[in-house]
Amino acid sequence: MIKVWDYLKEYELLREDILSAVDEVFKNGTLIFGPKLDEFEEKFSTYHECKYGIGVGNCTDAITIALKAFDIGAGDEVITTSNTAVPTVTAIVNTGASAKFVDINQYSLMDVDRLENFINKKTKAIVPVHLYGQMCEMDKIMELSKKYNLKVIEDCAQSLGATYKGKKAGSIGDVGCFSFY
């Protein structure tokens, strides 16, 4: 078997730092919330050039929370791409909304030339999924979101550090949702 990632080699390099950080969290009794979360949120949002950063359990939770914050639910439709993982769709369904799927372009990302055909009066949001370190064509997505007054929630689970025209993943739409997948 060919390993894609040899995490043991990386772990050995970082072992002392990892164990020290875990030990500090447990000694301080701040496993949930606390100064390490505050530090992470600050550093993560600064890196992505965003005003806020809120740590949650995973990208599914982040997308669900974002959709609910925009009052998206039963009877609403959310457009995403057909080439996504189950968690993206799970987040949409968790709100009671229906997912509508736009096909992909030659780069395996949302085909923005087909996007407008899926927008109707029930559409409330677009969830573009940035994949493989590549970002969707955000100019067109943002143009359509303004035209139809839609929210844009970027699924950035596989695009940490990616950029589109100098802007980082998660910093273009209304909300960017990440994971450490």
Regions found by a protein language model. Give the residues of each.
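PLP-dependent aminotransferase class I/II
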Residues: 8, 20, 35-43, 47-53, ...
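Structured loop/turn residues at beta-strand edges in well-structured enzyme cores
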Residues: 20, 48, 73, 121, ...
